[in-house]
Amino acid sequence: MTQTEKYRQLRTMIPEMRRVRRIHFVGIGGAGMGGIAEVLVNEGYQVSGSDIADNAVTERLGSLGARIFIGHGADNVSGVDVVVVSTAIKHDNPEIAAAKEKRIPIVRRAEMLAELMRYRHGVAVAGTHGKTTTTSLIASIYGQAERDPTFVIGGLLNSAGTNARLGSSRYLIAEADESDASFLHLQPMVTVVTNIEADHMDTYGGDFEKLKSTFVDFMHNLPFYGVAVVCVDDPVVRELIPRIGRQVVTYGFSDDADVQALNFVQEGHSCRFTVRRKGKDDLSLKVNLPGQHNVLNSLAAIAVATEDDIEDEAIVKALAEFQGIGRRFQHLGKFATPNGEVMLVDDYGHHPSEVLATIKAARAGWPDKRLVMAYQPHRYTRTRDLYEDFVEVLSQVDKLVLLEVYAAGETPIPGADGRALCRSIRQRGQLEPIFVASPEQLTSVLPDVLADGDLLLCQGAGNIGALSRELAATELGFAKVENN
């Protein structure tokens, strides 16, 4: 069977979708949007999309045959059958207005993902933290077991060189986004809930009980024969278990977990541990990821694979050979600078719990290194809502360079900006943070901060990821200093 024939065969899963020929994405450059677009391109649809700037996602989609527009305009939706919108897109976007005027259906990203999942065996991974890593680990195990899954991930799976892939099997493994409650569109066979914390609370009217109930509703989207895989170590998830009217498999370090981790040891960038499962032999494992939080992510993947009768050999091999995900404790190299050797790591975590987990992983793996963090807060609302948590967590590094908040389209909030956060950390008295008003100044500041043996951790969900790559290209800013 040729590749084209394989894709044509997949399209017959949803015969009515054959009426749809051209699909347009507004905000196509995001990882989640781009991933779905890539799957649809490979299924044979004519895909177009727009974004405010070119990036690696748009370049890849263009190379696959998608038509990419830089900038938003009403003419971009001419002749399309459906428009898919990102949650980041405002209602007054000209393409949205034009689609409404032309009576073109407008759907959210999760609705399109739900259509891809409708006639497949869907595995949907939800939770405040760990979604991308857990989804990537599950996809890697299924790939190792030759299940050839389709996957849509919110980060670059290094082994595949992409964050999305169209497989030939019935499996679809994807992240489920709770940020706008759109994960309620999904109808999976297996759900994973890694943890539940207060985040994206504007979606839930500031009501944490509503957030918890929405997660229960998400798990009740399972058929009666489906399985909810949940982390029993998380106190909120544990509290919700009696409310879940489906089969539940628990995982964690807790003694009552169905899939339990024992004998955890971190060795640099890797972790070793033993897995105990009910009715199964214990497994001795190594996962090529640092930190106790990544052992939990691994347990979730192991629980899903075990429920699907995947061989232990495939699980062990996939975890040991896992090549990581872009911007998830991504080691960008060691650099010999005039001040000495510095190790550079890039990480996407932007919630206090995620930042703390990254700090703990760095401390456990490299206890002798001084930890220098360049942190860029993400969204004014998150900074406001979790302000004291950020002050406490960011005070735990050895040296802090604090950037201004990455707005992500939000209006600045007085008292929730980078300067205010820097001032509060200074008043706490554990360290003297350095405030950087614009990202471009980071490369000029670091040469005066770094010393031999440091671990430099670039942390955040905004454009600090691009800054970390620039740092790697300029020898952590020293090359710029020498050229001036």
UniProtKB/Swiss-Prot annotation:
Reactions catalysed according to its record: UDP-N-acetyl-alpha-D-muramate + L-alanine + ATP = UDP-N-acetyl-alpha-D-muramoyl-L-alanine + ADP + phosphate + H(+)
The entry's keywords: ATP-binding, Cell cycle, Cell division, Cell shape, Cell wall biogenesis/degradation, Cytoplasm, Ligase, Nucleotide-binding, Peptidoglycan synthesis
Gene Ontology CC terms: cytoplasm
EC number(s) from the headed UniProt entry: 6.3.2.8
Family recorded in the similarity comment: Belongs to the MurCDEF family.
Ligase is among the record's keywords: yes
Subcellular location: Cytoplasm
Organism placement in taxonomy: Bacteria, Pseudomonadati, Pseudomonadota, Gammaproteobacteria, Alteromonadales
Residues reported in the UniProt entry to bind ATP: G127, T128, H129, G130, K131, T132, T133
Species: Shewanella amazonensis (strain ATCC BAA-1098 / SB2B)
Protein's GO biological process: cell division; cell wall organization; peptidoglycan biosynthetic process; regulation of cell shape
Broad EC category: ligase
Domain of life: Bacteria
Gene Ontology molecular function: any one: UDP-N-acetylmuramate-L-alanine ligase activity
Record's function text: Cell wall formation.
Pathway: Cell wall biogenesis; peptidoglycan biosynthesis
Protein name: UDP-N-acetylmuramate--L-alanine ligase
UniProt keyword Cell division, yes or no: yes
